[in-house]
Amino acid sequence: MIRIKYSGLIVFSSKIFSIFTGLIFIVLVTRNLSIIEFGVWQYLSLILSYVIFPAGLIPYWVTRFYARGYPVAKASIISNMIVSLPFFTFFLILAPFASTIININLSLFYLISIQIFLVYLSTSLEALALARKPHLLGFEAFAFESTKIVLALILFTILKLGLKGVIATVNLAYLMQCLTLIFFLRKELIKEEEFNYKILKKWFSSIWLPLFNALPAFIGGLDLFILAALTKSASSLAFYKVASSVAAVISYSLSTSIALYPSLLKGGERRDVEEALKFFLMFAVPMSFGAVFLAKPILHIFKSDYEKASLLLFFMAPQLFLKSLTHIFGDVIVGVEKIDEKENTSFKDFLKSKLFKWPLLNYFRNGIAIILTYIFASFALTYFSNDFSLYAAFSCLLANIIADIFLFIKGYLTSIKAVSFNFPLNKLFKYCLASAVMVIALKFLNPVKSLETIFTIAIGSIIYFLCLFSIDFESRIIFKKVFTYMKKFNLWE
C-alpha cells in the first residue's frame, strides 16, 4: 500500500517539475526561433504525431501481461520496434511531399524521424515500468525534462543552432529517457526468458482492441474543429486552450494513483481503490479550489487579454476534477477484467468484456459532446453578438461538462459493481475544509503580477497542508510512512 503511494508521489512530483521545465523550454524556444521557424516545428510535430500514434498499441497488452508475471520484457521491445519500421518508412516516403506544402528543408524531416524509434522504444519500456515499478515513470520524466533544459541552454544560447537545435534537444532528451528506463529495468531485461510467440500472436491478433480504446481521444478533439468552423475565428480556440492548459494541471493529480491499475491486474482489492482515491483527492481538491479562486491572476501570467477566460476556468476546473475521477473509475473497470488471461479468447469474448464496453462508453461521451457543441455554439453565435468568441468557447465547455457528467455517473456505477469500494466522502470533506482555509488566505494576499501569483500559489500549498495535517491524523501518518519508505528504498534496484 505504501509502495503505491510512494510511486504516486514520485510521478506527481515529476509532473509538477515538468510544468516549470516546460515553461522554461517554451520560453527558450520562442525567444530563439522566429515565428515561421516555430510554426515549422509545430508542423513537423503534427505530422510526426500520426506515425507515433500506434506506439501505444502493443504496450497496452504488455502492461496487463507483465503485471501478472508473464516474462514478456524482450517481446515487448522487439515487437514494438518491429511495429515502428513501416511507420518510419511511411514518414520518410511522405517527407518530400509534406516538405513542399510550406517549403521546409527536407533535412529537418530526417532529423526529427529519429524520434520515431525513440518514442516506440520508450513507450514499450514505460509499459514494463508501469506494470511492476510505476515510480520509474517519475524518474524518466525527471531525466527527460532535465536533459531538455540543459541541452536547450547549450544548443540555443551558446551554439545558436536554431530549429535544428530544438529537434536535436528533444531527440537527445528522449534518448536519455530510454537510457534511464533501461538502467532501472536492466535486471528484468537481461534475464533469460523464452520468447513466447503465442503471446506475441495474441497481441497482434487483438491489436484492434487498444486501437478501439485509443480512438476516442482523436474523436474528442472534433468539438474544437466544430467551434473553429462555426466561429471562423481563432479567438474562441485561444480562450478555450489557455483555460484548459491551466485546468489540465488538476489532472496531474492522477499520477498519484498510477500504481492502482497494475495493482488491480495483480489481484488488488477494494482497499487499494479506496486508498488511491484518498491520495488523489488530497492533491486534486486544493488544485481545483486554487484554479477557481485564482483564475484571473493565473491567466494574467499568460497575458492580460486572457483574463476574460476566467469564466471558462471557473467551470473547467471542476470539470477536470470529475474527468480525473472518471479516469480512476475506468482503471478499476478494466483493471479487474480477466478475460485476456484465457488462452483462446475469441473476438466475441472481447466484445462482451469490460475492455470493450468501457471504451464504447467513451465513444458515446464524445458523441454527446460533439452534438451539443454544435447546438450550443450555434445558439451562442445567434444570440451573443458581443464577446461571441468567449461565449462560443463556453458553449463548447458546457457541452463537454454535460458529456463528462454522463460518463462520470456511468463510470462510478460500473466501477462499484466491479469492486465494491466506498467513496471516501469523509476525507473529501476534510480536503475541502483545508482548501477553503487556503483560499481565504489567498484572497487576503490578492496577487496581481505574475511573480506574485506564483509566490501566492506556493504559500497556498503550505497553508493547505498545515491545515490538513492539523485536522487529519491519517494524512500525517501517510506522509511519514512514505518518506520512511523512501529512506529504506534502494534507488538503484
Regions found by a protein language model. Name each.
Residues 139-187, 247, 360-375, 384-414, ...:
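Hydrophobic alpha-helical transmembrane segments
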Residues 21, 25-50, 163-164, 202-206, ...:
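Interfacial/gating helices of multi-pass transporter permease domains
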Residues 65-70, 118-141, 318-365, 371, ...:
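Membrane-interface junctions at transmembrane-helix termini in multi-pass inner-membrane proteins
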Residues 52-71, 130, 247-281, 330-339:
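Helix-loop junctions and terminal segments of transmembrane helices
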Residues 420-427, 442-493:
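Membrane-proximal transmembrane or re-entrant/amphipathic helices at the cytosolic face
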Residues 20-23, 56, 77-103, 111, ...:
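Alpha-helical transmembrane segments of multi-pass membrane transport and lipid-handling proteins
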Residues 2-60, 88-95, 115, 149, ...:
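Signature of the first transmembrane helix
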Residues 1, 109-110, 135-139, 163-169, ...:
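Interhelical loop/hinge segments that connect adjacent transmembrane helices in multipass membrane
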